[in-house]
């Protein structure tokens, strides 16, 4: 049984052969098979995902891994009645100027991504990926839509969400604020829009938000906004051929 799964979308978008391996128990992980599959399938890059705990240093060396990110998913219980009065406007259409502003914010947000630090992917491809997330929110192929906040006619922040009505979970997929409008409460306004949307347009009971642990401001902001539970800690490594 293969231990590396080929990621078709990532491979196509980034133009290199990319795989992923979920490493649940390093003691039972077959290092020789892992390295054999990399060579046999000519993977240029493999994401290795480890949950809860870091890999031992010796295992990192055996697998030729580099730790690229520590991703935390926090959650909060959601009560619709507390947010029904909030004003919201989930958009699937933006003006050309709004789209360009949103692209710029998304591209600026890309600098914190692990892909941005990965030389096999590069800065421009990472910026293209974050622009794609805006497109995929507007066409509803991944996210539900885009919330924006404007200051003096200019988009100052964007916020993308995804709703799972079956599991009754709302997910944050991207939040970005223009650097010129930091510390003006834009992020809070964006998140409150999504609270209002979910309170009136869904039956969700939980909101989950993944973010990079490297972003200490984001951690503090989550706590401030009521996220009080850590759902998951994910250590993301890259193995390069």
Question: Model-predicted segments: where are they?
Answer:
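Conserved acetyl-CoA-binding loop-helix of GNAT-fold acetyltransferases
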Residues: 28-37, 174-179, 183-198, 220-224
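Active-site rim helix/loop that mediates acceptor-substrate recognition in acyltransferases
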Residues: 54-59, 123-146
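Conserved active-site alpha-helix within GNAT-family acetyltransferase domains
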Residues: 53-67, 188, 213-231
């Amino acid at each position: 049984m293969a231990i590396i799964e080929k990621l078709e979308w990532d491979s196509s978008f980034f133009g290199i052969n990319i795989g992923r391996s979920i490493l649940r128990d390093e003691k039972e992980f077959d290092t020789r098979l892992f390295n054999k599959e990399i060579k046999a399938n000519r993977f240029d890059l493999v994401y290795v995902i480890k949950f809860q705990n870091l890999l031992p240093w010796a295992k990192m060396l055996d697998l030729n891994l580099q730790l690229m990110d520590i991703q935390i998913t926090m959650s909060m219980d959601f009560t619709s009645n507390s947010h029904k009065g909030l004003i919201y406007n989930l958009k699937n259409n933006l003006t050309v100027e709004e789209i360009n502003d949103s692209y710029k914010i998304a591209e600026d947000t890309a600098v914190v991504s692990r892909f941005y630090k990965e030389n096999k992917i590069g800065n421009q491809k990472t910026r293209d990926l974050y622009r794609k997330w805006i497109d995929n929110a507007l066409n509803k192929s991944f996210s539900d839509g885009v919330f924006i906040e404007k200051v003096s006619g200019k988009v100052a922040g964007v916020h993308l969400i995804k709703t799972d009505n079956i599991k009754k979970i709302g997910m944050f997929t991207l939040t970005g604020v223009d650097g010129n409008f930091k510390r003006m409460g834009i992020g809070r306004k964006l998140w409150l829009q999504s609270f209002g949307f979910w309170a009136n347009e869904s039956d969700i009971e939980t909101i989950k938000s993944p973010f990079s642990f490297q972003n200490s401001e984001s951690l503090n902001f989550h706590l401030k906004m009521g996220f009080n539970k850590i759902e998951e800690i994910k250590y993301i490594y890259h193995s390069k051929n």
